[in-house]
């Protein structure tokens, strides 16, 4: 299988031609047309077909490829159906190499060895896995080698020489060179990175005779020949998907065949057919700056089997750079002096309140409340935001982007950006913008821009997708200030470090007030920022129970919940190996919670390890139970908690009832609930009767 790819490049070289590498998403616009399109690509002169494995959360792809994915997934395309399509294409006379291209989680879910064996059986020649870097792909590459199937690495303009050497060493057929930073997309303005010759020259220094295929931004025949002058192959994907989207039903195969013939025509100066026209000529740009290589990763990337850096190559170097700056800050007392100098601004230390009436109501253990809701901005999020803003300063970045669900992280980020004079853009799902309109307005009052995300479920998960894409495109000037302990290394460790102030203060305050450690600490769990912030300082204290309260939504016996640790299975999502709510085919499951901040299908890797090792317990709290906790704290303690925190209040109440009266538990009140009053009002007519709460007037 690998040999056929090599022969394709060798034949093209002998004929003094470039290999046209084309891309089409499997099942787009439907399976029958996919096969005809593959025939059309071959008939038009394509030398290799990349057959896309559709994925619900394609963080490296632009809107065109994502639209193809969306249509394919609506057609119920799974990895098994991709294999069936390859077999049908081979039976229909497609003889050129077929490379399966996509994201790792569907493959991980199916099984590495099983995937590779099946691919070989049906006639696929290799794999390009966007978010599986060679460090994470050791076992996968070994199995590919054993089966004679190719594993194609990707390099980007940001790839350092040191890393380039590693990537070149694992290439067994060709190297995919990403011509520019950013997500996938044809070059609608006719712009091709003129630093491409230097990039290809740098790759060849390590690749030797291994062929290079260059992609991202190729649109016209002029592009094809210009890119081909410095490469062995030219990759075209988004433009093909765009043509298929615009084609009349049943004509896509003919359209792409004509387009391939146009791309590879010998005279690129000939007039461009109207249907293939783009907006201009090749632009000039300075060579891409290459960051000096980092010798090593300073900190462990994983918590047991969880964690890692499952990211597109374009993100790798900036994560390495971020880790280096963080590691130096971690061991620099001046950094921590500066961090602590903002404690008065943040409202730290936060209070540890004894909940006397709530304790009496539950009739069991003493209940204490860690009042992160009293922080500046109304939540625990300020801890992480101040810390990461200081890192961004050290990185020399002048712009901040972030995702937000309930808006608490968006508000905290906007606060810090204003305080430090940085531009700020917040990505927020359109549905979350609706149900958290007050926080949207707060963010704008603070001078930040809010970008509503209309893709997918229009919630936190989709906001993370868009923030990651934006970061790749603006990486030189922008820091992605992630709000939870999720994502690729080093983000989970960074967020945990800055949020650990919650647990550290709790430990000291309990010693002062009770001369002992708490018997249990309780926190809500979405991505995991407040929970790991509370839990981490107590990990080694085996006498302290740790209880995480997830969003049970309508109940875990329904599909409408966000209880990742209760109901999820191990997968790879948003750059990290962790527990994920996913379907059997590895596609990410839609989620639901009354609380926008917990409405997320993944979770931080350290929390996954705490579950896997049974160090912490996790329960699912339904929307109705959440409102019970919300009501109890309002009525008994005069505190309106965030709906996120209300999950922990309910879980803490139930735990307190089971424990003796000489025990102490601490519940993290991660945020205040004024942002949620409208949501509660909307939900009470539905959920109120279930808990006997009627506030209608």
Swiss-Prot record:
Catalytic residue list: 50 (proton acceptor), 61 (proton acceptor)
A single cellular component GO annotation: nucleus
EC number: 4.2.1.20
Cofactor(s) this protein cannot do without: pyridoxal 5'-phosphate
GO molecular function, one term: tryptophan synthase activity
The keyword Protein biosynthesis belongs to this UniProt entry's keyword annotation: no
Protein name: Tryptophan synthase
Species of the source: Schizosaccharomyces pombe (strain 972 / ATCC 24843)
Gene assigned in the entry: trp2
């Amino acid at each position: 299988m690998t040999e056929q790819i090599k022969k394709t490049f060798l034949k093209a070289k002998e004929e003094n031609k470039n290999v046209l590498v084309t891309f089409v998403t499997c099942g787009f616009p439907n399976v029958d047309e996919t096969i005809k399109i593959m025939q059309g690509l071959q008939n038009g002169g394509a030398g290799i077909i990349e057959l896309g494995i559709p994925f619900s959360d394609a963080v490296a792809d632009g809107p065109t490829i994502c639209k193809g994915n969306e249509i394919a997934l609506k057609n119920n395309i799974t990895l098994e159906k991709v294999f069936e399509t390859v077999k049908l294409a081979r039976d229909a006379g497609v003889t050129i190499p077929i490379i399966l291209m996509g994201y790792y989680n569907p493959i991980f879910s199916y099984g590495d060895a099983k995937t590779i064996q099946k691919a070989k059986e049906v006639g696929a020649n290799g794999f390009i896995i966007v978010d599986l870097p060679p460090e994470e792909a050791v076992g996968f590459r070994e199995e590919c080698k054993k089966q004679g199937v190719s594993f194609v690495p990707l390099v980007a303009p940001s790839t350092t020489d040191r890393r380039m050497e590693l990537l070149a060493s694992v290439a067994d057929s060709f190297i995919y060179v990403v011509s520019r930073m950013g997500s996938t997309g044809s070059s609608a303005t006719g712009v091709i990175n003129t630093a491409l010759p230097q990039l290809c020259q740098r790759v060849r220094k390590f690749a030797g005779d291994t062929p290079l295929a260059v992609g991202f931004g190729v649109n016209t025949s002029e592009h094809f020949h210009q890119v081909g002058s410095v490469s062995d192959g030219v990759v075209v994907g988004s433009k093909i998907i765009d043509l298929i989207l615009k084609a009349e039903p049943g004509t896509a195969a003919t359209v792409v065949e004509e387009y391939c013939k146009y791309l590879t025509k010998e005279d690129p100066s000939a007039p461009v057919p109207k249907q293939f026209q783009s907006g201009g000529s090749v632009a000039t740009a300075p060579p891409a700056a290459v960051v000096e290589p980092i010798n090593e990763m300073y900190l462990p990337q994983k918590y047991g089997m969880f964690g890692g850096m499952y990211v597109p190559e374009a993100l790798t170097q900036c994560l390495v750079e971020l880790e280096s700056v963080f590691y130096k800050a971690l061991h620099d007392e001046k950094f921590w002096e500066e961090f602590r100098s903002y404690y008065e601004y943040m409202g730290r230390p936060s209070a540890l309140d004894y909940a006397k009436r709530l304790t009496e109501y539950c009739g069991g253990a003493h209940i204490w409340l860690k009042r992160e809701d009293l922080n500046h901005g109304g939540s625990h999020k300020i801890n992480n935001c101040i810390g990461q803003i200081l890192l961004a300063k050290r990185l020399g970045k002048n712009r901040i982007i972030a995702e937000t669900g309930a808006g608490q992280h968006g508000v905290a980020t906007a606060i810090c950006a204003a305080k430090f004079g940085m531009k700020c853009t917040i990505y927020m799902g359109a549905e979350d913008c609706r149900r958290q309109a007050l926080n949207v307005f707060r963010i704008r009052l603070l001078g930040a821009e809010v970008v509503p995300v209309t893709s997918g479920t229009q919630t936190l998960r989709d906001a993370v997708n868009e923030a990651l894409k934006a970061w790749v495109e603006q990486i030189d000037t922008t820091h992605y200030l992630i709000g939870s302990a999720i994502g690729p290394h080093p983000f989970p460790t960074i967020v945990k470090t800055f949020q650990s102030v919650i647990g550290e203060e709790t430990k000291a305050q309990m010693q002062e007030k009770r001369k002992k450690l708490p018997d249990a600490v309780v926190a809500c769990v979405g991505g995991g920022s407040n929970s790991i912030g509370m839990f981490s300082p107590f990990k080694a204290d085996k006498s302290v129970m740790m209880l995480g309260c997830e969003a049970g939504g309508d109940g875990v016996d329904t599909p409408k919940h966000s209880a990742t640790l209760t109901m999820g299975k191990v997968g790879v999502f948003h750059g990290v190996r962790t527990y994920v709510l996913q379907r059997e085919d590895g596609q990410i499951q839609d989620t639901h919670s009354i609380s926008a901040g917990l409405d997320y299908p993944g979770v931080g890797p350290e929390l996954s390890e705490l579950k896997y090792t049974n160090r912490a317990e996790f329960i699912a709290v339904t929307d109705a139970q959440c409102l019970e906790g919300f009501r109890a704290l309002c009525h008994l303690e005069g505190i309106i908690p965030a709906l996120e925190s209300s999950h922990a209040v309910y879980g803490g109440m139930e735990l307190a009832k089971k424990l003796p009266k000489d025990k102490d538990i601490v519940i993290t009140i991660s945020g205040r609930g004024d942002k949620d009053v409208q949501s509660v009002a909307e939900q009470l007519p539905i959920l109120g009767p279930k808990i006997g709460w009627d506030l209608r007037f």
